[in-house]
Swiss-Prot record:
Keywords: Ribonucleoprotein, Ribosomal protein, RNA-binding, rRNA-binding, tRNA-binding
Name of protein: Small ribosomal subunit protein uS7
InterPro entries documented for this protein: Ribosomal_uS7, Ribosomal_uS7_bac/org-type, Ribosomal_uS7_CS, Ribosomal_uS7_dom, Ribosomal_uS7_dom_sf
GO terms classed as biological process: translation
Species of origin: Geobacillus kaustophilus (strain HTA426)
Lineage, broadest ranks: Bacteria, Bacillati, Bacillota, Bacilli, Bacillales
GO cellular component, one term: small ribosomal subunit
Family to which the UniProt record says this protein belongs: Belongs to the universal ribosomal protein uS7 family.
Function according to Swiss-Prot or TrEMBL: One of the primary rRNA binding proteins, it binds directly to 16S rRNA where it nucleates assembly of the head domain of the 30S subunit. Is located at the subunit interface close to the decoding center, probably blocks exit of the E-site tRNA.
GO molecular function terms noted in the UniProt entry: rRNA binding; structural constituent of ribosome; tRNA binding
Pfam families, per database record: Ribosomal_S7
Superkingdom, natural source: Bacteria
The protein's assembly and partners: Part of the 30S ribosomal subunit. Contacts proteins S9 and S11.
Amino acid sequence: MPRRGPVAKRDVLPDPIYNSKLVTRLINKIMIDGKKSKAQKILYTAFDIIRERTGKDPMEVFEQALKNVMPVLEVRARRVGGANYQVPVEVRPDRRVSLGLRWLVQYARLRNEKTMEERLANEIMDAANNTGAAVKKREDTHKMAEANRAFAHYRW
């Protein structure tokens, strides 16, 4: 915790094409080594692929995918009398979005398609259909929380 009071939350500007702060945050998650224009090109091409394959608005597909990936519960380690317990806690709204975006990009990178654009597009489409690795990650997180429900009274 900082000694000088709470840290001010930085706000991102909405992206120029879709006018969405979520899209800007996703671009920032995709970005490696500060190459933002490359990250933008990857995302916009992925959105074009989504539009082409589904015939729907890519923003709607992306928002549905994000909704399906965002976790409601997670476990946090809590030390009680020399033992570490995995205590299930609710995820804060801003952290839910951050985790959802992070998992989408992380599991898109692990896919086997040739280009990052294809990987990202397919991961977003899979997530929108409630399949894919990012959705599995959310399910695993929820399963962990459910398995450790007995320790819920240690919440802080």
